[in-house]
Amino acid sequence: MDDSEVESTASILASVKEQEAQFEKLTRALEEERRHVSAQLERVRVSPQDANSLMANGTLTRRHQNGRFVGDADLERQKFSDLKLNGPQDHNHLLYSTIPRMQEPGQIVETYTEEDPEGAMSVVSVETTDDGTTRRTETTVKKVVKTMTTRTVQPVPMGPDGLPVDASAVSNNYIQTLGRDFRKNGNGGPGPYVGQAGTATLPRNFHYPPDGYGRHYEDGYPGGSDNYGSLSRVTRIEERYRPSMEGYRAPSRQDVYGPQPQVRVGGSSVDLHRFHPEPYGLEDDQRSMGYDDLDYGMMSDYGTARRTGTPSDPRRRLRSYEDMIGEEVPPDQYYWAPLAQHERGSLASLDSLRKGMPPPSNWRQPELPEVIAMLGFRLDAVKSNAAAYLQHLCYRNDKVKTDVRKLKGIPILVGLLDHPKKEVHLGACGALKNISFGRDQDNKIAIKNCDGVPALVRLLRKARDMDLTEVITGTLWNLSSHDSIKMEIVDHALHALTDEVIIPHSGWEREPNEDCKPRHIEWESVLTNTAGCLRNVSSERSEARRKLRECDGLVDALIFIVQAEIGQKDSDSKLVENCVCLLRNLSYQVHREIPQAERYQEALPTVANSTGPHAASCFGAKKGKDEWFSRGKKPTEDPANDTVDFPKRTSPARGYELLFQPEVVRIYISLLKESKTPAILEASAGAIQNLCAGRWTYGRYIRSALRQEKALSAIAELLTSEHERVVKAASGALRNLAVDARNKELIGKHAIPNLVKNLPGGQQNSSWNFSEDTVVSILNTINEVIAENLEAAKKLRETQGIEKLVLINKSGNRSEKEVRAAALVLQTIWGYKELRKPLEKEGWKKSDFQVNLNNASRSQSSHSYDDSTLPLIDRNQKSDKKPDREEIPMSNMGSNTKSLDNNYSTLNERGDHNRTLDRSGDLGDMEPLKGAPLMQKI
């Protein structure tokens, strides 16, 4: 081979290598250009097969990032470094879309670039240089079509977290960016592709813990996440919970359960639950009305069924939860809660964020299991709103209360009482307060079994504001109506209620300053709740009363409260009622139950002649001449007998000793003369009856003090009351006061006519229908007054008392107890020989005063009885018939007793704990409103 051929071959090889190097450089440049263009322009890369699938399903898969769908704003912010092309690829009909550019407000310009593989051409060029070198270059040219389109969008305000303030604009108007082939309608024509509307029903940041709701239950709502799922914007919702309307709007930060409610500048989240308090209610409906003050509602099965009516029909707006639940409430009868009041610009609740705005087109309330689940959510705002909403649901709805218990909601609420945030434990306590009120006693037991009482006490000791303290004490008041919880409250809550509420806010001071005026009573509603709770537990048993009496400062503060209220001319308040009823219960059996009670006991007076009006024979034995001569004389001619001074004390009385001191007696007298409330009158008369019971030193002093204060006429006036309980209490007090001889004379002169008027029969009181216990109490009082009191017996005959007594015996429609009590009075009257001739002249026969108790009616008594002329003893026995009223009837302990040491005492206690609603016409009661005090009295 000659040199020219070698040189030509070398030249060709060099040319080829140079061309290869240039081609490689060009290829790298093209790839770099492609990579750069792809990184800048590519948004969506859809293959024809995927595109056909998307068009067939009518949905579009959006990029998923960090557990949520990425919207336009997210794609603008995302990094492009993760988009790489790893070498040459088969770009089969790729579609590229540029990032939209906002040309002007409301418009976005998008550029679409499309490659046409069919139109790709290869261009080959051959170049020969002067030295004979041939250079061949092959270049592939692709056909690229660039299209620019403009679309109009509605700006969506963004929040600080990058998500829209109102998600409805995104969920309803979001247009996924696609290639132009896919941005056509079904007929091939141009048209935007609209993504599926969101289907979330609760806030986008509402996530449950991995274990469902943080706990599992053996029964009730399931704890698995499949049942309720995540409550974020991309939550997985079961079909039965999915909204039925296509125009359903995704919740926004303005919705009811938004995680971070907006509060004015300088405000705090605590302001969300600030309400202007009204008088405390048995149940509170702590909610605010949103959406133009229309109330919310749910179907009876907590369903979310689509309501009928046009979208403009206001009836489609959800009404209050209690509306037509279980068909328990008639249609169109709603129980409105007072609207929350704004305080210093704060928001009463999250509902008010949307006040004045139209409701969402397809909003649904969360179901009861969902609300209970929200109590375990990690955000405090969700917990507090769920608790407040649960309190609203339970208002006047026993079915919901029972369902909350069955769904294990009560343990969660009790656990929230220890939560550090006020809005959380306040809402939980409010829900427990409503749950604890009602006919279902199992709710109270459930709270007790969850250690609810100790939890309430812990919260009470930490509470420093009136609103929270009021709810806590109201809940304890509700719980105290159940017998099995009373001692638990005494053991755990007594000292906390006394030290944290009664003493600090009563105005009483442990070291009083004589020069200082009485302090004003603070937090009256809280004191009312606390006194009502202690009033209930004081009827439990002697052990409870002993602990209450010995609680340091309790009796002192109670007496101070009543004195202060009387001084303010407010003797008819509920606070006075609860305090006086509590003092009455603490005075029950006080002569027996106080420490060292034996030092106050007095011996029974000796009776010189046991044969008298109370002899075993109806007509008695012959009396001595001295006895008959002394019968008509006044036994208290000596003026010294009309005045009895209380023992002198070296130190002021404190604690339980105040229960039988002159100052407390004057309180009862003032209430008898000034108060118009039947319950207060009854309690005052009952307290006097208790203090005058038994043979003890202070009982004798108090009987005399009441006569000196001219209280006998005030008590006798109560016999004309229209309220049976007041009449019965006054009758019992007069009976005990009649033990004093001087009192007996005055009562016989002034009270016998009123006592006779209250007996059944005759025309004067034909409309009255007193119970058996009241009639027996009146008869026993009459017998006590006329015994050894001839003038009183004559007064009885003059007021047609004989006719009524005989009618009770012979009518055949009275109970055995009434017949026996009337027979005792008739026997006492016939025992006076001075009255026999006048009675015979009036047509009465001896047989009218002889009563065969064997023939008495036994319809209301099946037990054996004592066939004697002595009063029947029905010691500590309650009436079989419960009066149709809210208050607990005063028991008839000792209404017919043999010994003065055991009778004449009364204890005010609740007999039927199932009655929780007050009825009109009851003593001092009213229909419980959303702000009315709890009417649970003992």
From Swiss-Prot:
Signal peptide: none annotated. The record marks K401, N478 as: Essential for interaction with cadherins. One of its GO terms (cellular component) is midbody. Residues 10-46 form a coiled coil. Residues 1-357 are annotated as: Necessary and sufficient for interaction with CCDC85B. Belongs to a multiprotein cell-cell adhesion complex that also contains E-cadherin/CDH1, alpha-catenin/CTNNA1, beta-catenin/CTNNB1, and gamma-catenin/JUP. Binds to the C-terminal fragment of PSEN1 and mutually competes for CDH1. Interacts with ZBTB33. Interacts with GLIS2. Interacts with FER. Interacts with NANOS1 (via N-terminal region). Interacts (via N-terminus) with GNA12; the interaction regulates CDH1-mediated cell-cell adhesion. Interacts with GNA13. Key regulator of cell-cell adhesion that associates with and regulates the cell adhesion properties of both C-, E- and N-cadherins, being critical for their surface stability. Promotes localization and retention of DSG3 at cell-cell junctions, via its interaction with DSG3. Beside cell-cell adhesion, regulates gene transcription through several transcription factors including ZBTB33/Kaiso2 and GLIS2, and the activity of Rho family GTPases and downstream cytoskeletal dynamics. ARM repeats 1 to 5 mediate interaction with cadherins. This is Catenin delta-1.
